[in-house]
A protein has these predicted regions:
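Active-site anion-handling motifs in enzyme catalytic cores
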Residues: 1-338
Length: 338
């Protein structure tokens, strides 16, 4: 009997670190599941924020197919973004295959295009990034909305009530949103993360213990100062919660994606790149859903004010259907690289 050796699939920028970010956990779960049902299993991954060249060079260079989860890393020439592109170059230099998927691409150095010009599959999560990457590489680049929205969620309830207020990558926005949550009994403060502080996989030993103690102290203080706040354990709990709300107010792209996936109306405060604005443009939603922290203080946030229009709902449903189909094609094509 002839044995068939499976190709070695390696992922870099694995953003599911202990389930901390619910949307990130969902993206990585979708990547794993979609590869698995096509007979491809991930043999190893490099966590977000880690330089693969430090301790994972052997793993990355053993890949037959390297999957780079671009996420929000590839903007403004970030050092961590360059690490991902250098991984692509290393694997392509060995004659193996690389797929860069689910990527933001914004305001990057001119030479970055050279680093991915030979990558087998290029796929961005917003049309602005597609245009920028096409200009940088001269290549065809696919567009699929964030992978967190590419697979169906549990059935959405027919009735909704209450307002969920989230957090932001910016501490001042998180603080302002927490203050906003005290303005009404209808408001509940629920971040889209399992805890207040992220524990980087870079931290080990004494540094990790100290960071853990600090994070625990900060979270206890946050909960004491914000009686309406609670942290959920996982993605399923968050999806169940947000799908029952009449409005989500957030400063995170993560929470906007999950609001759209569950057809929950939202208002968003601008983040650290164009990702939320681009998502609103791509779907065709009311641009007034995007606001600044200053304007949010004067915004009518009453239930029903931000319900989706018939056109918005139709646009969401059309995009989710298209992205589901396009994601299936994407993973079929990744499997075909084997």
């Amino acid at each position: 009997m002839i044995s068939v050796t499976k190709p070695r699939i390696v992922v870099v920028n694995d953003t599911d670190v202990n389930g901390y970010h619910f949307r990130c956990a969902r993206v990585m779960s979708i990547i794993r599941n979609q590869l698995s049902i096509r007979g491809l299993d991930i043999v190893g991954s490099v966590a977000v924020s880690l330089n693969w060249q430090d301790a994972n060079a052997k793993l990355v260079n053993s890949a037959d197919i390297l999957v780079i989860n671009g996420e929000g890393t590839l903007h403004h020439g970030s050092r961590k973004g360059r690490w991902l592109l250098e991984a692509a170059q290393s694997v392509k230099g060995r004659g193996r295959s690389v797929a860069l998927i689910n990527a933001l691409w914004q305001n990057n150095p001119a030479d970055w295009g050279d680093l991915i010009r030979d990558v087998d599959i290029l796929c961005c999560r917003d049309s602005r990034s597609v245009s920028a990457m096409v200009e940088a590489t001269g290549r065809d680049v696919r567009f699929i909305g964030d992978l967190s929205m590419s697979q169906p969620v549990p059935q959405v309830p027919s009735t909704r009530s209450g307002v969920v207020i989230g957090d932001s990558v910016h501490a001042n926005v998180t603080a302002a949103l927490a203050k906003l949550a005290t303005k009404s009994n209808e408001f509940e403060l629920v971040p889209v993360t399992s805890s207040l502080k992220f524990l980087s996989p870079n931290l080990t030993g004494l540094r990790r213990k100290l960071r853990t103690a600090y994070a625990t102290m900060k979270q206890k203080r946050f909960l004491a100062q914000n009686p309406s706040a609670r942290f959920l354990a996982n993605e399923d709990e968050y999806l169940s919660m947000v799908s029952k709300k009449s409005l989500s107010i957030t400063g995170r792209f993560h929470a906007v994606c999950l609001a759209i996936a569950t057809q929950t109306p939202f208002v968003a405060v601008t983040s650290n790149s164009w990702k939320i604005e681009a998502l609103i443009e791509d779907i065709g939603l009311n641009t007034e859903r995007m606001t600044t922290l200053t304007d949010l203080a004067n915004t009518d946030l009453s239930e029903g004010r931000w319900d989706y229009s018939a056109d918005e709902l139709a646009n969401i449903e059309a995009c989710l259907t298209d992205w589901h189909s396009a994601a299936n094609t994407l993973f079929d094509d990744i499997a075909a690289l084997a």
